[in-house]
Amino acid sequence: MTDAEVIPLTKGLAALQTALPFIVGCGSGMVATTCVQPIDTIKVRLQLADRSVLRVTTWSIARDLMVEGGILNMYQGLSAAIMRSLVYGTMRLGLFSTFEKELARRARERGTTLSFGERSLAGVGAGALAAVVGNPTEVILIRMQTDGLKPLSQQARYSSAVDALRRIASHEGVLALWKGAGPTLIRAMSINFGQLTSFSEAKNQLQEHTSLSPPVRTAVAAGIAGCLGALISQPFDFVKTRLQNQVKTSPTVGLGSGELLYKGTFDCLFKVIHKEGLFRLYRDILPYFMRIGPHS
């Protein structure tokens, strides 16, 4: 092989190495998303329920979904969830791995190891960038999952994620696709901090201080990451769901006068805590943990 042939091959391998974290993130995210979609649909409906009026549980919602449309009804919005995974999931995992490797390289040049603070920076930065780009897919997913809660005359009945994207942008304006961007951004940063950062740190600490086998270390680290990710990000996921579900023309989520029930993140937090109590923000944490756990 000549030098001229080696150079393109080297460049190709370098490009593949750069793209590999994004490819892995995309593939693993899509598999996890498909597996947990029923739990996510239940979680969203639980978060939208007014617990001061309604007595609902994970099992009652699952039963109602099955009665309404069978097992396929549990997969409402799957096309939007896959789109979300392609955009948000790919970016958050791929960018985290890329940032972490670059920071580790710089640490080696200084003669030190990657610190927890640097890992946290990689996680928070990756989550923030992925959230900004992926917010439209979050809005689409929430709308498709909750469409069945509205009266038949008000249901949009989106045929696919692309159809939802087009119709929301057309009827409500492009900026409607960035509804709830604030809590989505904070949630993504907190998930990445609690999930990815703690997973890497826990696995590293377990390797240094225990004699656990690699598979066990990975499982324990994933459990720690899932718990921390859920605890830190649950309130922001709750607010995100409430904000992104709002449509001015729907009296089921508005005030009946064309106004939105919640004006923003803090208004939503205040009204929910005032009406339903502080514990409401964490009341549905079990299905939320089951939702994000497989992504750990």
Swiss-Prot record:
- Which domain of life does the protein's organism represent? Eukaryota
**Is Transport tagged as a keyword?**
yes
**Which keywords does the record carry?**
Membrane, Mitochondrion, Mitochondrion inner membrane, Repeat, Transmembrane, Transmembrane helix, Transport
Q: What is its induction?
A: Expression is induced in response to 2-benzoxasolinone (BOA) exposure. Expression is also induced in response to 6-methoxy-2-benzoxazolinone (MBOA) and 2-aminophenol (2-AP) treatment.
Q: Which family does it belong to?
A: Belongs to the mitochondrial carrier (TC 2.A.29) family.
Q: What is its main location?
A: mitochondrion
Q: What is the stated purpose of this protein?
A: Solute carrier protein; part of the Fusarium detoxification of benzoxazolinone cluster involved in the degradation of benzoxazolinones produced by the host plant. Maize, wheat, and rye produce the 2 benzoxazinone phytoanticipins 2,4-dihy-droxy-7-methoxy-1,4-benzoxazin-3-one (DIMBOA) and 2,4-dihydroxy-1,4-benzoxazin-3-one (DIBOA) that, due to their inherent instability once released, spontaneously degrade to the more stable corresponding benzoxazolinones, 6-methoxy-2-benzoxazolinone (MBOA) and 2-benzoxazolinone (BOA), respectively.
Solcar repeat residues: 16-102, 114-205, 213-296
Could you tell me the membrane topology recorded for this protein?
Multi-pass membrane protein
Q: Where in the cell is it found?
A: Mitochondrion inner membrane
Q: Which cysteines are joined by disulfide bonds?
A: none
Its name, as the record gives it, is Solute carrier protein FPSE_08119
Source organism per entry reads Fusarium pseudograminearum (strain CS3096) (Wheat and barley crown-rot fungus)
Signal sequence residues: none
Residues spanning the membrane:
12-32, 122-142, 219-239
GO terms under biological process: transmembrane transport
Q: Which GO terms describe its cellular component?
A: mitochondrial inner membrane
